[in-house]
Structures are given as structure tokens and as C-alpha cells.
Amino acid sequence: MTQTPPRWDLTNVYTGLSDPKLQADMQWVIDQGSALEAFYKSDLLPLTAETDPQLLNTRLNDLLERLQASYLKAHTIGAYLNSFISTDSYNKEALRLHSQFNIQTMPAQNTAMKINAWLGKIKAALPAALALPGPAHEHAFSLTEAAEQAQYLMSEAEEILANELSLSGGHAWDQLQGTVTSQKTAGIELEGELKQLPMPALINLHGHADEAVRKLAYETELREWQTIEEPLAACMNGIKGTVNTLNKHRGRQDALHSALDMARIDRKTLDAMMGVMTDSFPMFRRYFRAKAARFGQEQLPWWNLFAPVGKSERRYSYDEAKTLILENFASFTPELAAFAKGAFDHNWIDAEQRPGKRGGAFCMSVPAVKESRILCNFDSSLDQTMTMAHELGHGFHNYCMFQANRTEMQRRTPMTMAETASIMCETIVFNAIISQVRDPQEELAILETSLIGDSQVIVDISSRFLFEKEVFERREKSELSAEELSEIMERAQKATYGDGLNERYLHKYMWTWKPHYYDMVLSFYNFPYAFGLLFGTGLYAIYQQRGADFIPDYKALLASTGMGNAADLAASFGIDIRARKFWQDSLAVIEKKVDRYCEL
């Protein structure tokens, strides 16, 4: 287990931060922003809702050609700079370039906002123009969506001011949270030696085999978060206050309103899903209590929530995890395995834990080279192996869109649909492993890993939803102290985990380190994960029924997730996401795992 996991390689994109090509591309994007503004004024602004459909179609085609080229290069530059910032928050040059690029491309963002407002004004003319063949027709969904969302724009001057202030406001608070938490380390005694660990490594000790270590890590973590709770509370207040103010001036009902539109679902869908999730809490509490009993406890303290059970000594070297993933991906389709092998072989994955690197995991596309890059914090556990499979699923999703030659706008997938492939890949690996197990204790350990993940996505995500909802509501009246934020967090955990957890040992500081709370653009960065788990689980059930002929339809779905709303995309598989039954059927799959866990 001494093998050091790899760091990612992006030298096929740029050779480094001082690469002249990077500088040239950044300047090109800036220049294109100026050209786009001139095009908007001369070629778009004079057009009205009465403009001839053929002329409007021609101008829209021209617009799309300009936008796609700029978006592709800007997205690639952003991903490249993020590859440094997310793995080394001490890299001042990357931070400087990132800030510089954001400032210099702000005029282009303002122009894009003006174009969206213009689309809203000519909305009545769009159907006829978009019916004509060509790029505009192929981007009908994106253009129509932009026109409909234009009703929630402030005046041009107000939107420009909001955009420019965001760099020193909401986005600055977001960046501060990331910097403060990624640079935070904690001293903890392990095996008689005092070690200084980055916080993600400390958090990963929640899955340590020794309860004494887990408890010490939990106590250390709470103590360390308390030392920086004030600046993090300021970040939370700054972002939520900004979002509330902007939503009010944009005519939004609340922060959830924009989150639903960005997720491309409606409140009926959310209510159906969240209602069924709430109904499932007793089932998950049964799992929590069964787990507690294995430790001689009536209820779980937080430090045992992620504890391994069963035959837990199984650890994976990075190469073993790779082999496990590739073999099981191949059982689904050789194409998935070939994609994943390429990701491993070409060092698309940054898996090493180290100071300055952010916690958690993510996958980002690098469109200029039609590739993805994956960040995780590999610690040889089955959980982190499953995380790697999950993120490779995101990469395969990107691969399917690149294979279908989707443009930047066509690839803009909402969070709800973004988890489709990742959950599928996780499920493939889990089901393959569990089907081969003969030892009940090993089966228990694998079920445990899966149920920890399921309970996080259903129960903990519900607590995050309740937390964020109350924070937004109370932030309208006043700022919230760090103590108040912790109280709201504990209250949300009690409402969801219930008697499954020991109320004396909850985690009141979960709000400090989850980056999802600090995104100024995407609020309620939580319920889409539950949607993804349950939608992916439902799709896997369809795959089990249909077999190999499911694969082409599945790939077509992945290639199209940026080109329709969630209800229409789901309907192509006969799924009604506004009805409770689909969500109940997906949770019934999880309940079978809970039943088996309790039997063991």
C-alpha cells in the first residue's frame, strides 16, 4: 500500500502556466469578447420580433459560430487553471492568472447577458427562425431556454454591475472558503506519532478500522473547524445575502426557483422526489441502528457513521483499484472499459492526497482536447475505489458527448442529469463485487460501503437541503453567526437522521467545509445528487431487464443531456419523474440492501 497515487497530466493542453500558447489563447478569448460586442450591436440589436425568420436564422447561425469557438477556448483555459488551483491552493501564479482571466473576460460575460436579454425580447420570432435547418435549429433548446430565462434578468446596467461586483463579492467569498479550508491542517497522534494532516486526510479517518482513531479524528476535526468558523460564517453570509438580493431584484420567487430552473425540473418533480425520500427515513434509520448494534451501541455517534464493518481489512493499492474498475466496466460494455483504461494510461486522474489540494472528488471536461480530468483523494479504501468509478462515469458521460460532436452549448448538462453515468458506473462495480462474494463478512463490508453512500445521498442530502432552506430564509432578515449556522445544521441532522444517530454526537460544522454551500451561481447544490442516485438506480433496473440493447439508447441519452429538460429525457425511457412511483421503485432497490444488511 506504499504506492503513491498519480497526479494528473495536462501537458497536451498547455506545457505550463508560462506557455506562450496559454497567453495567446487568453488574449484571443478577450479579443473575441470585443468582437462579439460589436457583432451584437451591429447585427443583433436592430432585429426585432417582426424580423424575417430567414434573416433571423442567418444571424443566429453566425452568433452560434462565434459563441462556440469562444466558449470552447474559455472553458479549456478555465479547466487548465483549475487543475493547478484545485491541487495546490498555494500556487500564486495560477491564482493570479485565474483572477486576471476572470476580470478580462467580464466584458464578454456582460455581452452574453445582453444577448440573452435580446433573445427574450424577440422570443415570439424564435419558433419560425429555429424551424429552419442549420446550427440554430440544432441549438433550439438552448436558445429557447435562454429566451425564457431572460424574464429573470435585471436591467442591462444592473446586470453588468452585478457581474462586475461578483468578482469582489460572491465569487471572492467562494474562493476564500476554498483557500481557507484547503490550507487548513490538523495535528493528530497516529500510532504514537504526531502527524500534521490536511483536512481531507483527517476527514478520511472517519473510515479507519480503529474506533479510537475515528473518535479522535472526529473530535480533532470539530476543534479545528471551530478555529476558522468566523471567516467561514462570513463567507456563507456574504454569498447567501448576495443571492437573496439578486433573486429579489430579478423577480425570482426564492433561491430554490433558480435552482430548479438550472436543474431543468419543476417543483412537482422535486416535491414528489423529496416526499418519497422523507418517507424512506425510517428505513435508513433501521440501517443506522443495525450498524450501531454492531458496535454495542443503541444509536450511532457521528464518528461511527462511516466506520467499516464486516471483513474490513481489504485494502486496494491504486493498481488493484484500477484493475477492479476496468474488469467490471468491461462487463457492462467494452467501450466503457476502454475509455477508463485510457484515463488511467494517460494520467487523467489526480489521486494523491497532499497539502493544498481540495477535498472530495470531481471530474471536469477539457473540451479543446475532448478529454476529461478527475480529482480524488485515494486512500486505498473500497469507498475511494467506488469514488474513482463514480468520477470515471462522469468522464464517460463527457466522452459520449464528445463522440456525438456536441457543442459547448449542447453539452451544458444540469446537475440532475449529470449524475446519470456516475451512478451507473458505481452500481456496475458494486453489483459485480457483491455477486462474487461468498464470505458473509465480506458481503457485509461491501454492503456497508454502498449503504454509507446511499444514506449520504438520501438522508444527508435532505439535511443539507433543510439547512440551506433555513439559512436563505433567515439571511433575508439578518446575518447569521457561526453559532447559529451550527445550530441550524444540527437541527437539520436531527430532522433527517432522527433516532438513527446519537444526538450528543452530531456534526454541527458540516456547513464549514462542503463547497456546495458556497456557490453563488448554483444554490441548493444538493438535491440534484439525490435525483442522480435515484434516476441512475432506475436506469440500471431497466438495463437489467433489457440487457445489451439498452447500451445504444443509454449512450444516446448521455450525449443529449444538455439538449432537453429532465422530464422529456426521462420520458424516452418511459419514466415519469413527476410521479412518486418511479422514486419509490428506486428506493425499493436500496431497501433490499438494507434488509440484507440487517440479516447479516
Sequence positions of predicted segments:
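Short pre-active-site segment immediately N-terminal to the catalytic Zn-binding motif
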Residues: 313-318, 369-389
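Post-HEXXH active-site segment of zinc metalloproteases
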Residues: 386, 398-423
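Active-site scaffold of zinc-dependent metalloenzymes
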Residues: 354-381, 398-399
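Post-HExxH zinc-binding segment in Zn-dependent metallohydrolases
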Residues: 412-441, 450-452, 456, 532
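Gly/Pro-rich turn-and-neighbor structural signature
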Residues: 301-359
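C-terminal, non-catalytic "cap/extension" segments appended to globular domains
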Residues: 1-5, 11, 17-18, 130, ...
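Active-site recognition of the HExxH zinc-binding catalytic motif
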Residues: 251, 379-399, 422, 427, ...
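A well-structured
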Residues: 1-311, 599
